[in-house]
């Protein structure tokens, strides 16, 4: 969980201080956004190969690869914090490890947890991701203000190396007693795996929901500080507070919603609810004003929208089966991050049309309405206990 949190910490740490980075490194808004955008871009390229490695070698082998990239490149950033090319190369290096870590969560779950606890376990794994986001969005601005950019990168670099060492020292590949009935592992090729999962109607539809949900979240995470500042006059520090509270609320959602889902053996209603509440909250983000109103809106948005991630990952296992746990999650993440590669810069383009963020927010609200329609078409995946 700690290593997974680090990937999100490093993904968003520059987005939390994008105004500072633009002014001190003398670069454009797009160049600053690129420091975060390389993560979904790399995910698109490596997600499926990472998924196949997970299914063939197991979660420890895969996450170990990711932990090495994360630790090493987080330290390289310290060499020259004011060199944009070095920061970009380091971000690319860290992003290379992300698919191997995040796609391994569901494989870890099916290895260590019984089926009746799947959604809860995936929710706890997702919780780690949001802890990383909270620290990145909430703590980074304060660290830079008080200690400077280099000290912030040094602290995060030490955390990265510590994560790598702790993973290899403490994590075991399998539990002493299997959590569920063991099945003979059959090696599958990438092509065979994709053909198998893409024959399943509900999984294809779930892929479109993931495409929109993950893409929209990436867009909001990248530009929220600027949206709050330009639309509502909220300062960088206050915007960071709202962003971190939004993600913290999502952390609670990732624990509570999967617990309820496991208890009542239902997934589909929560997937529909996430997109529905998300669309409403994006409209409120366009029209609402003031710190308090946006804080409350952020709490509601985070709780429901972010809780969709563990629900989607659990549904992917239930639809495709344990055999394809790695590649099915890899495919969903590929679609979602592929959408992010398009949505993040497109939001900036739409912002340029009228010089404000109303148009890009309207765009993602429409996308969430489409996600609602798609989610309704999926059959319930949870089996009665």
Residue ranges and their predicted role:
Residues 14-15, 201-254:
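Extracytoplasmic gate region of multi-pass secondary transporters
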Residues 45-83:
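Conserved MFS/SLC helix-loop-helix module at the cytosolic interface between two early adjacent transmembrane helices
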Residues 317-356:
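A late C-terminal transmembrane helix in Major Facilitator Superfamily
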Residues 56-66, 262-275:
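Cytoplasmic membrane-interface "Motif A"-like loop-to-helix N-cap segments
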Residues 174-206:
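Juxtamembrane intracellular "pre-TM" segments in multi-pass secondary transporters
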Residues 90-129:
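Cytoplasmic helix-loop-helix junction between adjacent transmembrane helices
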Residues 46-58, 254-266, 351-352:
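Helix-to-loop junctions at the C-terminal end of transmembrane segments
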Residues 266-315:
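C-terminal transmembrane helical hairpin of 12-TM major facilitator-type secondary transporters
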């Amino acid at each position: 969980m700690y290593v997974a949190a680090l990937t999100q910490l490093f993904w968003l740490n520059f987005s939390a201080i994008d105004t500072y980075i633009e002014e001190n490194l003398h670069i454009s808004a797009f160049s600053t956004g690129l420091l975060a955008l390389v993560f979904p871009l790399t995910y698109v390229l490596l997600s499926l190969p990472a998924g196949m490695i997970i299914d063939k070698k197991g979660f420890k082998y895969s996450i170990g690869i990711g932990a090495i990239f994360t630790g090493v490149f987080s330290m390289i950033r310290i060499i020259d914090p004011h060199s944009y090319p070095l920061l970009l190369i380091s971000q690319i290096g860290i992003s290379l490890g992300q698919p191997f870590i995040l796609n391994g969560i569901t494989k870890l779950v099916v290895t260590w947890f019984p089926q009746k606890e799947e959604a809860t376990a995936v929710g706890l794994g997702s919780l780690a991701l949001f802890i990383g986001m909270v620290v990145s969005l909430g703590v980074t601005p304060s660290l830079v203000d008080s200690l400077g950019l280099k000290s912030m990168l040094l602290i995060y670099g030490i955390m990265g190396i510590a994560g790598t060492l702790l993973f290899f020292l403490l994590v075991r590949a399998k539990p002493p007693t299997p959590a569920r009935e063991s099945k003979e592992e059959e090696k599958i090729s990438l092509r065979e795996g994709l053909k198998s999962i893409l024959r399943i109607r509900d999984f294809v539809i779930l892929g479109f929901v993931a495409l929109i949900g993950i893409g929209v979240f990436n867009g909001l995470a990248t530009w929220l500080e600027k949206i709050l500042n330009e639309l509502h006059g909220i300062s960088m520090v206050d915007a960071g507070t709202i962003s971190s509270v939004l993600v913290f609320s999502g952390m609670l959602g990732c624990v509570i919603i999967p617990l309820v889902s496991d208890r009542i053996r239902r997934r589909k209603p929560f997937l529909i609810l996430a997109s529905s509440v998300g669309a409403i909250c994006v409209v409120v983000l366009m029209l609402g004003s003031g710190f308090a109103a946006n804080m409350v809106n952020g709490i509601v948005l985070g709780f429901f929208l972010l809780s969709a991630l563990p629900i989607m990952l659990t549904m992917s296992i239930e639809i495709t089966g344990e055999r394809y746990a790695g590649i099915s999650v890899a495919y969903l993440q590929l679609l979602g991050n592929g959408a992010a590669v398009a949505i993040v810069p497109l939001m900036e383009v739409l912002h340029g049309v009228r010089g404000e963020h109303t148009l890009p927010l309207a765009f993602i609200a429409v996308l969430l309405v489409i996600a609602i329609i798609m989610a309704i078409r999926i059959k319930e995946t949870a089996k009665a206990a």
